[in-house]
Amino acid sequence: VLHGCHKTSGTHLVSEQPVERGRPDTTWQKAPQIAPRLSYPSVFRISDARELIYYRTDGHTSSWTYRISEDNGITWYGPEQDVTDLDMKGRVDWSSYQTKLPGKDGKFLHVVFTDYDDNKHSPAPERFYNPRYDQEVSNEWKYNLYYVKIDLQTHEVRNAEGKTLQTPIDIDYSKANCQIWDTEWRGAGVPPAVSLNKEGEPTFLHVLSEDDVRSHRYYYVRRENGRWGQTPICSSSHQWNSCHLRHDDDTIRAYVVAGEEYLEGGYMDRHGGGRIEEWTSRDQGTSWKKRRILSPTGDHYTGWRFNNVQAVVRSDGSEVEGMLLFYGWNDSEAPKAKAFLVHK
């Protein structure tokens, strides 16, 4: 168990015996520190019964890296160099938001990220100027998409073309070697969802601003014949609206947050929300149709907003088929929400 991590080492516990259904008591002991600071840790079971934790090493502008354990979390090791550190060569405050997913065999890690100027040291409003919209925005707008593939045996980091990259990756090196989509100053609050297609290749679902900073759209991003393409799916109501992507045998399923009006203000609404919809494609992502609304409807839920749609995962990080989790609220100011579970 690892909890309480945000710019701290958190609390790391290991059970003395395997946790099993029906066992009345579980005894936990404090485990060694994984790293001095961890933020946004993601944990996966990978090849050879190893465990992987991928994390940001401190605050917004810090590097991202990973550690691997072969003994149930007692000891950890990792690469000599971190994977990314966008502001390491003088581009002060350049940062990234990242999503990651192991390959089907657990030998590789797929990582996709956006970039943004955090503008925290010697802040200057003009650094938030967005030329597409001819206005200042904020650090809540993240741009472009970048992709790397990490070999979890050798720690080599490669781009989509298979080129071995120098690490840590800074912002200029990233633009030259890792960029898969120049969004031309269209921005998002969240990084994309990632899912593997039937060939085991990564595909992405990403929300982006459109005609102005109050209109948004979801895109399906994939690589075909050596080129990255993007297909629009549907409109959305906020740059912080989440999403989830899943590949079934002959259908791609996109779970999105839709709405007609841009949300702003309030403790809860300032980070988006709307209704949860499922959109599907049966032609490899070329065209999409809305299949259903997943979030509750009816008089009791009039005015509710929903967000953070995600898969239910097992202890090894794999998804439970047919189950989704999301959150909803009706008070824009109260810092609380209810969880909803969908099992088709």
Question: Where are the predicted features?
Answer:
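Extracellular, repeat-based ectodomains that mediate carbohydrate processing or recognition
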Residues: 1-344
